[in-house]
A protein has these predicted regions:
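A conserved mid-domain beta-alpha-beta active-site/ligand-binding segment of alpha/beta enzyme cores
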Residues: 62-114
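Alpha-helix capping and helix-coil boundary motifs
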Residues: 17, 51-52, 101-104
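Detector for Asparagine
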Residues: 16, 29, 54, 77, ...
């Protein structure tokens, strides 16, 4: 998790606070090669405002026309906040780590809280928001799961991909 946390904070530090650009630092979007972290993601780049990304998600959905009429774009934020908000990014990374390694969830939480506490890149307010989200292993909310399913954007685990020896 540390390498992903570091990369996420570097990303947040490099963008201008007035720039609305998304980043999805979930664990499964990374690989480690020769001690370096490599980012890969097949989702379209989030070089857009969150509202525009919400519209794109609906447009890509097989039910986009119907969903656009019944789901306010702001509700899609339940999915896309994790691409734009530092606290939600942390929660997403930690939640992903805990879901992939449930037996280590307590260790992951302890490490994550210590990382946040020691970070000089995070403001006091950032830390408070993150600590509120890391009281227990983060879980995906039912609304998050529903919106992802309805938009056809459920994600596929890539940990079962065969590795040639």
């Amino acid at each position: 998790c540390k390498m992903v946390f570091d990369e996420m904070l570097q990303f947040r530090a490099k963008i201008n606070s007035r720039t609305d650009i998304g980043f999805h630092p979930t664990l499964r979007n990374y690989s480690v090669h020769e001690g370096e972290l490599w980012f890969f993601d097949t989702f379209p780049p989030m070089l857009m405002k969150q509202r525009d990304l919400n519209g794109l998600i609906l447009k890509m959905s097989p039910y986009g026309g119907i969903l656009k009429k019944i789901i306010p774009l702001m509700l899609i934020n339940k999915v896309t906040d994790e691409y734009y908000r530092t606290d939600k990014m942390f929660s997403g990374i930690v939640g992903s780590c805990c879901r992939l390694r449930p037996d280590d969830a307590d260790k992951i939480l302890t490490f994550s809280r210590e990382y946040v506490n020691q970070s000089v890149s995070l403001t006091g307010e950032d830390k408070k928001r993150i600590f509120r989200l890391l009281k227990k292993p983060p879980r995906l909310s039912k609304i998050w799961i529903l919106i992802r399913k309805l938009s056809g954007n459920t994600g596929k685990p890539n940990i079962n991909t065969p590795i040639s020896a």
